[in-house]
């Protein structure tokens, strides 16, 4: 999935809004098709923020908060446009979708948009990646999109960004993960440098994650600072498995992929050792 990151930079795969942008302005208008026909719920900053422990990047009042919901249908047949994405993306009842409210925009990339949402039932904040089905089919990335979810369901590691849920609407796919307000690149851009002890800790945690993934036959193929989130205690959370692959023992991957700004001359040599190059 696209990086669940609050970094404000410009790379090929992620383009986050500039600090100070009105997140209830231009970007909300483009998403009205997702929650058309529904009302809005007005809630003050104190009420929303009292239900979560993370510090929001944007310190504006977030109201009204639209519902993360596609237009409800009385009956849902299973046409090919839905069955293609099963079973990784099941169809969720409308009432379950009504429990999610949008708090803000985290990032917007070529494959989709990542939203910060409030789960009213759990009283917890999550990140939801929204991917148009049309883009998935146009770019012939159906297998890649389904494998991203399948791989994340196999992973259970303290330094990996955990998958909460995945489902589909009539026009979009939704991938919900835990929310982290900071990534390694944003932290580095803010402080300018890391102490040696911090670098050792980050490196040790990253190596533990990569060894764990490789033992499962999983290669990430897009390890970079933007895809390394930080939890509230400062520990790493590797995220964005959109380019990952599951390989059988001894198999190799030969696809040239990743983020253009990070590719080197040896990028064509893609395999499990490729993850060790940042």
Swiss-Prot record:
Residue span, Protein kinase domain: 100-278
Source organism superkingdom: Eukaryota
EC number(s) given by UniProt: 2.7.11.1
Catalytic residues in the record: 222
Alphabetized InterPro entries for the sequence: Kinase-like_dom_sf, Prot_kinase_dom, Ser/Thr_kinase_AS
Pfam families to which the protein is assigned, alphabetical: Pkinase
Chain sites annotated for binding ATP: 106-114, 129
Alphabetic keyword roster: ATP-binding, Kinase, Nucleotide-binding, Serine/threonine-protein kinase, Transferase
SUPFAM superfamilies: Protein kinase-like (PK-like) (SSF56112)
Keyword Nucleotide-binding attributed: yes
GO MF terms held by the record: ATP binding; protein serine kinase activity; protein serine/threonine kinase activity
Catalytic activity: L-seryl-[protein] + ATP = O-phospho-L-seryl-[protein] + ADP + H(+); L-threonyl-[protein] + ATP = O-phospho-L-threonyl-[protein] + ADP + H(+)
UniProt similarity note: Belongs to the protein kinase superfamily. Ser/Thr protein kinase family.
Protein name: Ribosomal protein S6 kinase-related protein
Source organism: Mus musculus (Mouse)
